[in-house]
Regions:
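Active-site neighborhoods and metal-handling regions in enzymes and metal-associated proteins
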Residues: 1-151
């Protein structure tokens, strides 16, 4: 995983990209695809008027089907946050943050998943909320985990 970002004219960006070197296990490929699908679930419902916790729930249903752990346990973290003149700003995409999403907000969608033997993978996209939807500010990560340096 590469977690990176930059500052432009006082505003932050923050995004992750995942890749495998030479080959990827089935578990890693599956985890990456679930992260992509969770991000899609959030993007499908994201518009002004939805709440931060609704976005969390949409992603959590994909990442942890049939699970009941709530935010605040060690098992579940947030799945994104606001972005702007600080790297991490409100709202937090959690079960407890009921902030209503408004046009003009910049957010990260940042689902994470544990897989295999203590491994974690995170995907992160930057986006801007418009009056009628959302525009991605980062180039969308592919659904299939990129493999680099193939022998």
């Amino acid at each position: 995983m590469m977690d990176t970002g930059c500052v432009w004219d006082g505003y932050f960006c923050d995004f992750d990209r995942n890749f495998a070197i030479h080959h990827a296990s089935d578990a890693a490929m599956g985890a990456h695809q679930r992260l992509f699908d969770a991000t899609e679930a959030a993007l499908d419902i994201l518009k002004p008027g939805i709440s931060a916790n609704d976005l969390f729930s949409a992603m959590d249903r994909i990442l942890r089907p049939n699970q009941t752990a709530q935010m605040g346990s060690e098992e579940v973290g947030r799945y994104g946050h606001g972005l702007g003149i600080q790297l991490t700003e409100p709202p937090s995409l959690t079960t407890w943050d009921k902030t209503v999403i408004k046009a003009g907000m910049a957010l990260t969608i940042e689902p994470s998943i544990s897989y295999g033997d203590g491994l974690t993978m995170v995907a992160e996209e930057n986006l801007l909320i418009l009056d009628d939807g959302v525009v991605l500010l980062s180039e969308r990560a592919p659904r299939d985990l990129p493999i680099i340096f193939v022998p």
